[in-house]
Amino acid sequence: GLRMIGQGMHGFVENKELVLPDIDKALREPTDRRIFVISKAFRAGYTIDQIHELTKIDKWFLQKLYRIIETANELEACSKIQEVSDDLLRKAKIQGFSDFQIARALLKDKMEDTDKATLQVRQDRKYRGIVPVVKQIDTLAAEYPAQTNYLYLTYSGTENDVDYLGDGRSI
């Protein structure tokens, strides 16, 4: 969702550098970029309690965001995709990391190789069988059997809810 809000960011982590002279002040002021300030604050060593105190954002939500930071740190401890375990790669995808974000975490400051590294992450991920499944939204809350055209992709599943046609791409 964060990639779609038009802030020029890639998600909660692995973004361009956000320059903030006063993180406390930026956390206290609700803006359209505060979610990225929270990421920067976690990276700067702020605790969930400190961020909660400054933002009044629910600790449950902050804990979920902190887990994304922990995953980013685990990825950054690796220098190439082959060092990333299947479990870590799957966890990153479930948490919403794009292949680009994973590549950027592995590259650290060598940003000139991002396109090549992103493709390598994608190829390696697919080779390992870490691919999304198609799920169908149940618009009738399971009261009645419903066939809808409301579909989404997720890494949090094991099988597709729909059958593909013969070409393997069309539903």
Walk through the language-model features, giving the residues of each.
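ATP-dependent carboxylate/acyl-activation modules
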Residues: 1-171
